[in-house]
């Protein structure tokens, strides 16, 4: 649905991510577009991308959620990944990235969103076998180290493998 290709060019030209975000771009713009897309549209987009992967010889792809940023939408994205994975010879490794950024509707309630990810999203994804990994984005404008620890502890308690990507944007 939403893609950040135009923002990639801005980053190559030296524009800081914060400036792109303030101009209405960034992860939140992609979240809005992704939330509006139907499962069928998301499946079509994913099928096209996987076809490109296979054409270039890829045999494995980790595919992350992270553009729904609420339980219902993150589950929708992981279901799409799981369904399309059944149609391809490429090994698809789904990853829950519900802790990508705090969505705008939780901007003044960060604590509530961290709880939602740790106590609602992670257990539901685990129970329904929708993801292999749980990932957290710890960086400026994303999650703090302590918030990341809390979410990853929730995954650890369920024996889900954990990932962290950090300092992607920070100086």
Predicted stretch roles:
Residues 1-45:
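Metal-associated gating/positioning segment near the N- to mid-region
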Residues 26-47, 51-54, 59-169:
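Metal-coordinating catalytic core of metallo-dependent amide/deamination hydrolases
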């Amino acid at each position: 649905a939403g893609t950040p290709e135009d923002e990639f060019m801005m980053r190559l030209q030296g524009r800081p991510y914060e400036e792109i975000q303030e101009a209405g771009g960034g992860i939140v713009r992609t979240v809005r577009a992704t939330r509006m897309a139907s499962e069928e549209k998301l499946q079509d987009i994913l099928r096209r991308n996987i076809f490109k992967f296979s054409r270039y010889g890829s045999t494995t792809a980790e595919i992350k959620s992270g553009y729904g940023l609420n339980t219902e939408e993150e589950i929708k994205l992981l279901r799409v990944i799981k369904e399309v994975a059944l149609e391809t010879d490429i090994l698809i490794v789904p990853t829950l990235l519900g802790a990508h950024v705090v969505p705008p509707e939780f901007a003044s309630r960060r604590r509530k969103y961290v709880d939602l990810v740790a106590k609602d999203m992670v257990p539901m994804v685990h129970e329904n076998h929708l993801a292999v990994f749980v990932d957290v984005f710890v960086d400026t404008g994303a999650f703090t180290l302590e918030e990341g620890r809390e979410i990853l502890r929730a995954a650890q308690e369920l024996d889900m493998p954990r990932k962290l990507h950090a300092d992607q944007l920070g100086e």
